[in-house]
């Protein structure tokens, strides 16, 4: 009976250790995914900012061509 108890405790202990290792790997994967999302957000923010500047510049040029500049000319 003592042999069975020791075996059962050993199996349970090894199971808990493997679960702990799997949880750590899962957390690391989630952290990596979060970092990727932050990088994507950073890139999209840069693209969005450049697009806004490009549109503002283009609208200014169009206004100059049409004669709607702000200087009153």
Curated annotation (Swiss-Prot):
Query: Which range is the signal sequence, renumbered to this chain?
Result: 1-22
Q: Give a GO cellular-component term.
A: extracellular region
Where is the protein localized?
A: Secreted
- Major place of residence: secreted
Q: Name one GO biological process term.
A: defense response to bacterium
The alphabetical list of record keywords is: Amphibian defense peptide, Antibiotic, Antimicrobial, Cleavage on pair of basic residues, Secreted, Signal
Q: Which residues form the propeptide?
A: 23-39
Regarding tissue, the record states: Expressed by the skin glands.
| Family statement | Belongs to the frog skin active peptide (FSAP) family. Ocellatin subfamily.
Q: What does this protein do?
A: Has antibacterial activity against Gram-negative bacteria E.coli ATCC 25922 (MIC=60 uM) and S.choleraesuis ATCC 14028 (MIC=240 uM) and against Gram-positive bacterium S.aureus ATCC 29313 (MIC=240 uM). Shows no hemolytic activity and no cytotoxicity.
- By what name is this protein known? Ocellatin-PT7
This chain's source organism reads Leptodactylus pustulatus (Ceara white-lipped frog)
């Amino acid at each position: 009976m003592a042999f069975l108890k020791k075996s059962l405790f050993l199996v349970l202990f090894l199971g808990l250790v493997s679960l702990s290792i799997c949880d750590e790997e899962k957390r690391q994967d989630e952290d990596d995914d979060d970092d990727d999302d932050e990088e994507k957000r950073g890139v999209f923010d840069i693209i969005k900012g450049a697009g806004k500047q490009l549109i503002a510049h283009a609208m200014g040029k169009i206004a100059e061509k049409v004669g709607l500049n702000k200087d009153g000319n």
